[in-house]
């Protein structure tokens, strides 16, 4: 209720009170004298009390517009607070998302760098191994060529001095001499010079490990060859016994070589 309406309401209230007091103070009209012959009862009129509006205390007036305005301001403030909190939370989430993307990209770059470093190290190692292998092959080929040249030179000198005697003796010895030469050639190829004067501590360890591995490999090959030789001897003996047994019981067999002698 506005101030103008309250003022109009207060002005109308005294007028209504004065009208009610005048009605109460008005004298009652004398009733006409009733005829003695016929007296009829008059209907009584109901007395309606005047409507008096409630009085508003004069100490403090209620301003509904001010209450509504304050409530609207409070709601607006709460809404603005919620909006600020929402945008602050959204900004924080966006910053966290950006930081997460940066961490992912940084980790991806680190992994790529590590992979590139490992690939480069592996390539260098493979190149070093290939170079070492090529160097060893070149040294072995050079050494074989030098040995062959020495052998040819020795044979040519011996042929010039002794003529065809060496060729005949070589033909008589046959496979045994050839096997011996093969053995000597293999030993000369495997017997490499041990140049360790220029090596450091780490290189000496690698060289010792290489020699140890080589010895283990030779022992393994030797064991395999011994087992193979033993198996071959066993098979030869079995076949020889079968041949001997067959020749003993064969009917009409002539002379044959059994047990290293003729019968």
UniProtKB/Swiss-Prot annotation:
<feature type="region of interest" description="Disordered">
    <location>
        <begin position="109"/>
        <end position="154"/>
    </location>
</feature>
<feature type="region of interest" description="Disordered">
    <location>
        <begin position="1"/>
        <end position="64"/>
    </location>
</feature>
<comment type="similarity">
    <text>Belongs to the troponin T family.</text>
</comment>
<dbReference type="GO" id="GO:0031014">
    <property type="term" value="F:troponin T binding"/>
</dbReference>
<feature type="compositionally biased region" description="Acidic residues">
    <location>
        <begin position="1"/>
        <end position="38"/>
    </location>
</feature>
<dbReference type="InterPro" id="IPR038077">
    <property type="entry name" value="Troponin_sf"/>
</dbReference>
<comment type="subunit">
    <text>Interacts with TPM3.</text>
</comment>
<dbReference type="GO" id="GO:0005861">
    <property type="term" value="C:troponin complex"/>
</dbReference>
<dbReference type="Pfam" id="PF00992">
    <property type="entry name" value="Troponin"/>
</dbReference>
<dbReference type="GO" id="GO:0031444">
    <property type="term" value="P:slow-twitch skeletal muscle fiber contraction"/>
</dbReference>
<dbReference type="InterPro" id="IPR001978">
    <property type="entry name" value="Troponin"/>
</dbReference>
<keyword id="KW-0597">Phosphoprotein</keyword>
<feature type="modified residue" description="Phosphoserine; by CK2">
    <location>
        <position position="2"/>
    </location>
</feature>
<keyword id="KW-0514">Muscle protein</keyword>
<protein>
    <recommendedName>
        <fullName>Troponin T, slow skeletal muscle</fullName>
    </recommendedName>
</protein>
<comment type="function">
    <text>Troponin T is the tropomyosin-binding subunit of troponin, the thin filament regulatory complex which confers calcium-sensitivity to striated muscle actomyosin ATPase activity.</text>
</comment>
<feature type="compositionally biased region" description="Pro residues">
    <location>
        <begin position="44"/>
        <end position="56"/>
    </location>
</feature>
<dbReference type="InterPro" id="IPR027707">
    <property type="entry name" value="TNNT"/>
</dbReference>
<dbReference type="GO" id="GO:0006937">
    <property type="term" value="P:regulation of muscle contraction"/>
</dbReference>
<feature type="compositionally biased region" description="Basic and acidic residues">
    <location>
        <begin position="109"/>
        <end position="150"/>
    </location>
</feature>
<dbReference type="GO" id="GO:0005523">
    <property type="term" value="F:tropomyosin binding"/>
</dbReference>
């Amino acid at each position: 209720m506005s101030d103008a309406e309250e003022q109009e309401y207060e002005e109308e209230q005294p007028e209504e009170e004065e009208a009610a007091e005048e009605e109460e103070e008005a004298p009652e009209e004398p009733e006409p004298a009733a005829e003695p012959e016929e007296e009829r009862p008059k209907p009584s009129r109901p007395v309606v009390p005047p409507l008096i509006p409630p009085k508003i205390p004069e100490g403090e007036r209620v301003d509904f517009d001010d209450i509504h305005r304050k409530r609207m301001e409070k709601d607006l403030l709460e809404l603005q607070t919620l909006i600020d909190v929402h945008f602050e939370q959204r900004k924080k989430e966006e910053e966290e998302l950006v930081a997460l993307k940066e961490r992912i990209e940084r980790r991806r770059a680190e992994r790529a760098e590590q992979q590139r470093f490992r690939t480069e190290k592996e390539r260098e190692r493979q190149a070093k191994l290939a170079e070492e292998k090529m160097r060893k092959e070149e040294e072995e080929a050079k050494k074989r060529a030098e040995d062959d040249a020495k052998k040819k030179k020795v044979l040519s000198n011996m042929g010039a001095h002794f003529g065809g005697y060496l060729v005949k003796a070589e033909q008589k010895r046959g496979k045994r001499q050839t096997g011996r030469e093969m053995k000597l050639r293999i030993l000369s190829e495997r017997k490499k010079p041990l140049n360790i004067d220029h090596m450091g501590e780490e290189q000496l360890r690698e060289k010792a490990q290489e020699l140890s591995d080589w010895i283990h490999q030779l022992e393994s090959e030797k064991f395999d060859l011994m087992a193979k030789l033993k198996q071959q001897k066993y098979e030869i003996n079995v076949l020889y016994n079968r041949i001997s047994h067959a020749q003993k019981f064969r009917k009409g067999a002539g002379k044959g070589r059994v047990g290293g002698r003729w019968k």
